[in-house]
Curated annotation (Swiss-Prot):
Coiled coil: 348-410
Zinc finger (TRAF-type): 189-253, 254-311
Molecular function GO terms recorded: zinc ion binding
Name the UniProt record assigns to this protein: TNF receptor-associated factor family protein DDB_G0272348
Pfam families associated with the record: MATH_2, zf-TRAF
Length: 595
């Protein structure tokens, strides 16, 4: 079957490019359908989470159903549309879907476009060719889009989807439906403003979230009838006419009966009106018709009378004297019981106080005993330390004397060697005098390189105003001692208040000024403790200072924890001053003469 195309000019292009252009040209149509669906996205909600999830899924399905509405169901005067816009196979419109990816007329490379997209898909499942001319067609993607036909469809007149009772049977709602007839490309803007779309009841949605509520979902209604719906909706929120609380209309009777405290009710005894919040106090204290006990019921009167008759009851006869006497006797017994309990409590309290006093005395004795033991232990430790120091000093003195003796022997041997060399040189000069040759003299190394006697240095370094100098030391990291000489070398100490490596420790190092002298130093550094304490901080070491490491300092980077130093109870920081004792044994090394 062939049709004359008359004013239709067929243009071919790749499916991908034309599909992009087609989507842009028909974007309004797709968006308008989405907005129409959004107006109907509120569906039945129940009072539990699972039903809410199910309803959300139903909303999505409803949107997809509306997008699946065939254009042929909405088009106006379908019978007057030219046959060239109908599929030659299914006889439906060539473009029959609002989906953006399906709103197009497709054609083979020879320009045949007489088949709709659905029929093309069914045909290509069986044969890979054009239905009309037989040219090879590999897939839907190999077809091109006919832009002129597609654009023509955007101008077709359609009924508003909201003109029907629903989008399943497509039965016209002549009374309440939308009367607008629009072009397909105007659908989006129209649906944004259309007041005939169906919406779900918001009151039901909110009511379903309340706990322990059972309800029947209101049917969907059109937007423009929302005010009329709220007038009859049982779940609409209203204000209580008595207390002003916001409640659902369906709960009004329950609220008035069980919760509202401002509603007026009648007293069951006197039948006078009172607010519900006042009725209990009225009946308890004021209502003249309420039945109450006699005020002397504790004394034995068991009469039950109206409050208004109480005075009359009390004046009848003299029997209440006995009841009053009974009450007084009961009170006397109660007082006696309380006094007895009070006496027992006082005795118990005195016993506990006595035990507390005994425990305090025992604790003080134990504490004093512990302090005495600690002091004795500290004294013993100090005595042992002093003995050890004396022994070390004696050993050092003996070593010093031995070194001095060795140095004297080496000096004598060196002098003898020099004298012997001088004699030999003298003889050599005499023998070789005729030849006028003078031998060069080379001094040999003296034994062990030679050394001076050992020098001993003892002193104290007092750092006053420690807290102030500590703050000044922040900028240069240390506090420097005055210079002091040992033999021919000059030394000094550096105290690092915040540590050289770790901030929570104080560090101390011994330095030598730079020169060419080589010297071996045995040093002992001790932080003075001004109280009896177990804490002893000292550093001993032996180090050689020479030209290669003359600027290096030797000591301890973790000499004492800063917290221990600043703790007054430890006895190191007294009157904002610390004292450091130093004892140094230095041996200056003499290098051999060379020529």
């Amino acid at each position: 079957m062939e049709f004359e195309l008359e004013d239709i000019t067929i243009e071919q292009s790749s499916f991908t490019n034309n599909n992009s252009n087609n989507n842009n040209n028909n974007n309004n149509n797709s968006n308008s359908n989405n907005n129409n669906n959004n107006n109907n996205n509120n569906i039945n909600n129940n009072n539990n989470h699972n039903n809410n999830n199910k309803n959300n899924s139903n909303n999505k399905n409803e949107i997809n159903n509306q997008l699946d509405i065939p254009i042929s169901n909405l088009v106006v005067d379908k019978e007057n549309i030219s046959k060239k816009y109908f599929c030659t196979i299914c006889s439906d419109l060539l473009v029959n879907s609002f989906h953006a990816d399906k709103f197009k007329a497709v054609q083979c490379k020879n320009g045949h476009y007489t088949t709709c997209l659905n029929c093309w898909e069914k045909h290509l499942e069986k044969k890979k060719n054009c239905i009309q001319c037989g040219v090879d067609v590999e897939s839907i993607e190999s077809l091109s889009s006919n832009l002129l036909v597609t654009q023509k469809f955007t101008t077709f007149k359609i009924h508003c989807p909201n003109s029907f009772f629903d989008t399943i049977d497509f039965i016209k709602d002549e009374v309440n439906g939308c009367k607008e007839i629009i072009q397909i490309n105007e659908l989006e803007e129209h649906l944004k403003e259309c007041q005939y779309g169906f919406i779900s009841c918001k009151n039901c949605e909110e009511f379903s979230k309340l706990p322990f509520q059972e309800f029947t979902q209101c049917p969907d209604f059109r937007k423009n009838t929302k005010e009329q719906h709220d007038l009859i909706c049982p779940y609409v929120k209203i204000s209580c006419e008595y207390c002003g609380d916001i409640i659902n209309k369906i709960n009004k009777e329950s609220h008035n009966a069980n919760w509202c405290q401002e509603i007026t009710i009648k007293c069951l005894d006197c039948h006078l009106p009172f607010k519900k919040k006042e009725i209990n106090q009225h009946q308890k204290s004021f209502c003249p018709e309420t039945i109450i006990q006699c005020r002397y019921s504790k004394g034995g009167c068991n009469a039950m009378i109206r409050r208004s008759k109480l005075s009359q009851h009390l004046t009848e006869g003299d029997n209440h004297h006995q009841f009053i006497s009974n009450i007084l006797n009961q009170q006397d017994l109660k007082i006696n019981e309380l006094e007895l309990k009070n006496t027992e409590f006082c005795l118990l309290l005195n016993g506990q106080n006595k035990k507390i006093t005994e425990l305090e005395i025992l604790f003080k004795e134990l504490n004093d005993s512990i302090l005495i033991q600690k002091q004795q232990q500290k004294q013993q430790q100090q005595q042992q330390q002093q003995q050890q120091q004396q022994q070390q000093q004696q050993q050092q003195q003996q070593q010093s004397q031995q070194q001095q003796s060795q140095q004297q022997q080496q000096s004598q041997q060196q002098q003898q060697s020099q004298q012997s060399q001088q004699n030999n040189n003298s003889n050599s000069h005499f023998i070789n005098n005729n030849n006028n040759n003078i031998n060069n003299v080379q001094m040999s190394d003296s034994p062990n390189g030679g050394s001076l006697p050992q020098a001993v240095y003892k002193n104290k370094w007092v750092i006053s105003n420690y807290s102030e100098q500590e703050q000044q030391g922040i900028s240069k990291d240390y506090i420097k001692s005055p210079l002091f000489k040992i033999g021919n070398s000059t030394f000094f100490l550096k105290w690092f208040p915040f540590g050289k490596k770790k901030l929570n420790y104080c560090s101390i190092f011994l330095y030598k000024t730079q020169d060419d002298k080589s010297i071996i130093v045995n040093y002992y550094i001790h932080l003075v403790n001004n109280q009896i304490s177990d804490e002893v901080y000292e550093k001993r070491g032996c180090q050689k200072y020479d030209s290669e490491n003359g600027s290096a300092g030797y000591g301890s980077s973790q000499f004492i924890k800063r917290a221990d130093l600043l703790n007054d109870a430890n006895g190191f920081l007294i009157n904002d001053s610390i004292t450091i004792e130093i004892e140094i044994f230095a041996t200056e090394e003499i290098l051999p003469l060379q020529s």
